[in-house]
Amino acid sequence: MGAWVLFLRSGVMQMRNMFWPLRRKSRRRMARIVVDGPITGATRQRVLKALREVKQREFPALLLRIDSPGGTVGDSQEIHAALLRLREHGCRVVASFGNISASGGVYIGVAAEKIVANPGTITGSIGVILRGNDLSKVFERIGIRFDTVKSGPFKDILSPDRPLSDAERALLQELIDSSYGQFVGVVAKGRNLELETVKRFADGRVFSGEQAQALGLVDELGDEDHARRLAAKLAELDEDDIRPVTLGKQRRKLSGLLPGSQLLHQLQQRLSLELMGSGQVLWLYRP
């Protein structure tokens, strides 16, 4: 029995020695994670897995590239919470806003220590939206009628076969207001701003990166390389030589090589979010 235990211990030590150089090497490197497109459950799973790898490999810095109009509330909150935990672990996190980082993209971004945006980045859209579809007249025209048996008056709220009642609208507004309060509070805390200051521009409007800097939502103006250099400086890494290691890459399908595949992918994302987000509270910029 004793010999067997010694054998197991020896095996464990060998495994540790195999992976130890990888961990040591990562301590002088920078991780990079991309949040691209609408924030959904799939986004959350991919990003959280990548963040766990950043922690396990002990990267001293993370460059978080965000190019997203936002998305579902819960998924945005879980990514934000994981970023804060990573910072508590000692990792320096810098967010780089790309073409757009709005609504849920902002929520994720304010978990970073510093935010860098292009002067023309579309950002902001701090607010909450909830949409349903009233198709009652359409159903009436084609002769479709619904019979509903429910346990309470609000169980079929946002049902497409009838308009909202005043009581339902008031109930949903309370839900929206609660989510809005959470959003504004997180932005105020993350950006070290007064709550009332944030509320003055958190009415759903969008603004450029240049405007966002004037409002205190963004620290510096610059491209992704500027953000990379800032992250390297914070982590005391070589700004000139450091090249980020991208984690959590999205798998590219063979169809992505076909002409027009990018446009098709974008349309698929929008349609998927419309279907998934119907009746859900969203932190999403809808142009």
Regions found by a protein language model. Give the residues of each.
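N-terminal organellar transit peptides
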Residues: 1-103, 108-118, 129-287
